[in-house]
Amino acid sequence: MLKDLFGKSRYVTVKREEHTSSKKKAPGDDRLWTKCKKCKEIIFNKKLVENLMVCPKCGYHFRLTARDRLAITIDEGSFKEFGQDIKTVDPLEFPGYQQKIGKYKVKTGMEEAIITGEATIEGYPVVIAVMDFHFMGGSMGSVVGEKVTRAIEKAISTRKPLVIFSTAGGARMQEGMLSLMQMAKTSAAIKRLNKAGILYVSVMTDPTSGGVTASFASLGDIIIAEKGALIAFAGPRVIKQTISTKLPEGFQRAEFLLDHGMVDMVLSRHEIRDELAKILKIHQIGVVSNGG
């Protein structure tokens, strides 16, 4: 049974569709306006999209799809996807799992909760992986773990810096221990990347939690958090119910983690691409000066 874990899909045959930011409707579908979840401001959708899905009044960052994230991060036309042939199977024959995967494939136009590929950012080559919370809450199952691992291995073999945008609700319960195993698997791969001397920049977006936080997302050489992102292992509601104590203001938000030394910087969505380019430029200068 396990030998077929990364085989061709035996159950779901929904054809993958190209899913770009230009084709995707703004939040609210056919509506012209969106209400900000934080300040309740009514925002014209066109204005919201032009502002990279950030509320112009309070700065609240709406969640992005993986392809929208790619579109605002990498150089246009530079993306070469790999790993799209890895299909989700149902190793535990969990009731309803095949149907749920099929539903999310149709809903998101994606095969899984992550996209991996090679691209450039301001001309600097990278291996990039972007998770998508819209696909089963960004949960990490065996395919997500395998694609992250292959992205790491691609970075090692090509000696290109690795950039991973994380957003996840935790391990995928429908795959049981096989999903939990991905924490150790991806962490071991990051260790090999580290030994090879390859730069790894981890970007945590809202929300990043569970097994993803406890593995590769927290192992970057440089860890960037998007402004206002929830970053946690167990969420604040679970912790509050467990210890019956009122939590500090902003607990587990990006800014709180920065104050406590858990991330290196907190950036708005508008700043991330430029900051990545600066990091890559400095890294390239360092490699050249060392004869790399």
From Swiss-Prot:
Coiled-coil regions, chain positions: none
CoA carboxyltransferase N-terminal domain residues: 32-292
Keywords: ATP-binding, Cytoplasm, Fatty acid biosynthesis, Fatty acid metabolism, Lipid biosynthesis, Lipid metabolism, Metal-binding, Nucleotide-binding, Transferase, Zinc, Zinc-finger
The protein's annotated pathway: Lipid metabolism; malonyl-CoA biosynthesis; malonyl-CoA from acetyl-CoA: step 1/1
InterPro entries assigned: AcCoA_carboxyl_beta (IPR034733), Acetyl_CoA_COase_Trfase_b_su (IPR000438), ClpP/crotonase-like_dom_sf (IPR029045), COA_CT_N (IPR011762), Znf-ACC (IPR041010)
Catalytic activity: N(6)-carboxybiotinyl-L-lysyl-[protein] + acetyl-CoA = N(6)-biotinyl-L-lysyl-[protein] + malonyl-CoA
Highest taxon in the source lineage: Bacteria
Cofactor(s) the record lists: Zn(2+)
EC number annotated for this UniProt entry: 2.1.3.15
Signal sequence, start to end: none
GO terms assigned for molecular function: acetyl-CoA carboxylase activity; ATP binding; carboxyl- or carbamoyltransferase activity; zinc ion binding
Keyword Lipid metabolism among record annotations: yes
GO biological process, any: fatty acid biosynthetic process
Zinc finger feature spans (C4-type): 36-58
Function recorded in the entry: Component of the acetyl coenzyme A carboxylase (ACC) complex. Biotin carboxylase (BC) catalyzes the carboxylation of biotin on its carrier protein (BCCP) and then the CO(2) group is transferred by the transcarboxylase to acetyl-CoA to form malonyl-CoA.
UniProt subunit comment: Acetyl-CoA carboxylase is a heterohexamer composed of biotin carboxyl carrier protein (AccB), biotin carboxylase (AccC) and two subunits each of ACCase subunit alpha (AccA) and ACCase subunit beta (AccD).
Name of protein: Acetyl-coenzyme A carboxylase carboxyl transferase subunit beta
Organism: Halothermothrix orenii (strain H 168 / OCM 544 / DSM 9562)
